[in-house]
Amino acid sequence: MKPVLFCMAALLLGLNAAPDAVHAQSRPADRWVWSLYESGGSVVLANEVPDTTQLRATLECTPGEGMAVLSLYDPQAKAGFARVTAGTAAGAMEVRAARGGKVETTLRLDHPVFAAFVAGGELTVATGEHRTEVRAEPEFQGLLRRFGERCAGSR
């Protein structure tokens, strides 16, 4: 009788371990999101994997100034003059090299490119032959609108 109990206990312990193993295997991969932060007199909208150092892009402003710095964390991106597009809007802007291997440019929040980015969630920065695309999926476009409102001075 003891061998049967031992086998039953081993089987039950094995069954209890299986859901944890399945759960560990079915965890979603790191997911890119947009997060809005306000601290120290600035507003930052970051395209990131939460709780990591992984960034694709950030927008940063001082509330009410009507300008934002767009930083791109694309190792292929280069400094120089860029064509920035969103929807049917386009503009030429200077892209500067910045610390940490990123590049950045300044966007006017009343420019048609920013308005089209807020409306459609897609923006492209093309420097020479290289293109960096910034996307805010529909679930994050509310944060993009909120960023624009805070930075333009609307409350």
Predicted regions span which residues?
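An ectodomain-focused feature that recognizes extracytoplasmic/extracellular
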Residues: 23-78
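C-terminal segment of classical bacterial N-terminal signal peptides
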Residues: 13-21
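Short, exposed beta-strand/loop patches in secreted or surface proteins that constitute
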Residues: 32-38, 59-61, 84-86, 93-98, ...
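Internal interaction segment
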Residues: 88-155
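Extended low-complexity, serine/threonine- and proline-enriched intrinsically disordered segments
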Residues: 73-74, 78-90
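Bacterial N-terminal signal peptides that target proteins for export
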Residues: 1-8, 17-18
